[in-house]
């Protein structure tokens, strides 16, 4: 572990956070920022609006971290206790800052309001603290070193205000005061078609690396590997990451579909665009989810022509030319129907590729032979048509089945496009 004097700790203040009424997006933002600045960060604490418990949290944090970053509790109401509690912790008196009063009065005047007594509370800071201005609101923060080797930073809980104060004032201060001794450079590799456990088994030796480090993540069917290097410069970090990325890509093969801000839809779009090819989709159980993923990509109109949400069998027949006999014999959720849907939309819109999805998203509608979570994906292309079966299960619910099905359809198309190269 790094020297505690150069470690940061985030303390989020607010009973609403403890109750789960709001997400702690401030802590997430600050954690990512600290990582990018290369400042070690090992602990986070959430404390309600209670003076004694906040004092206890501060005393614990001050023994293990040299930079304590507080969000919340800077407002004008009685339960906003952060500033006065910190002053009490270090036995320092509060003093009113005239420049804060002037700033609040000006902001109130622009809104046609008059400064009230409770807002004067926001101008109280411990003697010796440096003002951390709030350009957007009335609650300023502070940067304060109550003792050698300890720095406190306070921010309001409003995310937009906190982020602006952090970026405009706190980050420059950290650079000027030698907190950013190295930077962290990261590369995120993205995988589809392999489970987290299977990928982890393949790349297990990489998890023992120290610089760069490799860590796995998984959500919504996608697996990610984050490669992170500590370095003196971005160029040095990139150089450390490059050979590790090359090895990981070689091991994973085509299960690795992209990196950083890539998505399955953006990768598929780039492949189609480069080949001058086009796509249409026919969806049943995803109800437009596949088309939505595609149309989030800027410029997708160059290669995506449109689609059909063929929920009812009559629509499958009239729009996609799925035969009534096939529907009667195999059922709407079947490989042959998925293939006929893909061919039907390909032919109707005249595109290079047609992709279809039909399945049972649940929670009802499943049978012993066709359970909830059963999905068929059809891919029609220049060299023919095929389908794949996936059984996602019912445990994670309807949205999970729909999200995975849309992602899998894009991945099957991606793999088909790569096979043409």
From Swiss-Prot:
Cross-referenced Pfam families: CinA (PF02464), CinA_KH (PF18146), MoCF_biosynth (PF00994)
Family annotation (InterPro entries): CinA, CinA-like_C, CinA_C, CinA_KH, Competence-induced_CinA, MoaB/Mog-like_dom_sf, MoaB/Mog_dom
PANTHER family, per the entry: NICOTINAMIDE-NUCLEOTIDE AMIDOHYDROLASE PNCC, NMN AMIDOHYDROLASE-LIKE PROTEIN YFAY
Family per record: Belongs to the CinA family.
NCBIfam families, per database record: cinA_nterm, PncC_domain, PRK00549.1
HAMAP family hit by this protein: CinA_B
UniProt protein name: CinA-like protein
């Amino acid at each position: 572990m790094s020297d505690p004097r150069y470690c940061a700790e985030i303390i989020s203040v607010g009973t609403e956070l403890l109750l789960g009424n709001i997400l702690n997006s401030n802590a997430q933002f600050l954690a990512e920022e600290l990582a990018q600045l290369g400042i070690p960060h090992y602990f986070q604490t959430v404390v309600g609006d209670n003076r004694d418990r906040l004092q206890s949290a501060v005393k614990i944090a001050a023994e293990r971290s040299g930079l304590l970053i507080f969000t919340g509790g800077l407002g004008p109401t009685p339960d906003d206790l952060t500033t006065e509690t910190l002053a009490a912790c270090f036995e320092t008196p509060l003093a009113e800052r005239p420049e804060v009063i002037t700033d609040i009065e000006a902001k109130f005047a622009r809104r046609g309001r008059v400064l009230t007594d409770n807002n004067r509370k926001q101008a109280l800071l411990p003697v010796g603290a440096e003002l951390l201005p709030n350009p957007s609101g009335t609650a300023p923060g502070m940067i304060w070193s109550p003792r050698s080797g300890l720095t406190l930073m306070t921010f309001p809980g409003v995310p937009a205000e906190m982020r602006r104060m952090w970026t405009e004032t706190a980050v420059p201060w950290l650079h000027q005061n030698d907190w950013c001794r190295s930077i962290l450079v990261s590369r995120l590799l993205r995988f589809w078609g392999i489970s987290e456990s299977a990928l982890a088994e393949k790349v297990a030796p990489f998890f023992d690396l120290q610089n760069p480090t490799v860590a796995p993540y998984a959500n919504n069917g996608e697996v990610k590997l984050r490669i992170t290097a500590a370095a003196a410069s971005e160029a040095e970090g990139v150089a450390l990451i490059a050979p590790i990325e090359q090895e990981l890509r070689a091991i994973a093969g085509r299960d690795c579909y992209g990196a950083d801000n890539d998505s399955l839809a953006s990768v598929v779009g780039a492949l189609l665009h480069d080949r001058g090819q086009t796509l249409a989709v026919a969806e049943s159980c995803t109800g437009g989810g596949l088309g939505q993923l595609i149309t989030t990509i800027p410029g997708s109109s160059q290669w995506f022509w449109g689609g059909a949400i063929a929920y009812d069998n009559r629509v499958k027949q009239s729009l996609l030319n799925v035969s009534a006999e096939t529907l009667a014999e195999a059922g709407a959720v079947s490989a042959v129907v998925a293939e006929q849907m893909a061919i039907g939309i390909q032919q109707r819109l005249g595109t290079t590729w047609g992709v279809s999805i039909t399945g049972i998203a649940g929670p009802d509608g499943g049978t012993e032979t066709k359970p909830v979570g059963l999905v068929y994906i059809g891919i029609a292309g220049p060299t023919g048509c095929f389908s794949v079966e996936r059984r996602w299960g019912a445990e994670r619910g309807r949205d999970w089945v729909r999200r995975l099905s849309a992602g899998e359809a894009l991945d099957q198309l991606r793999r088909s496009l790569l096979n043409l190269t």
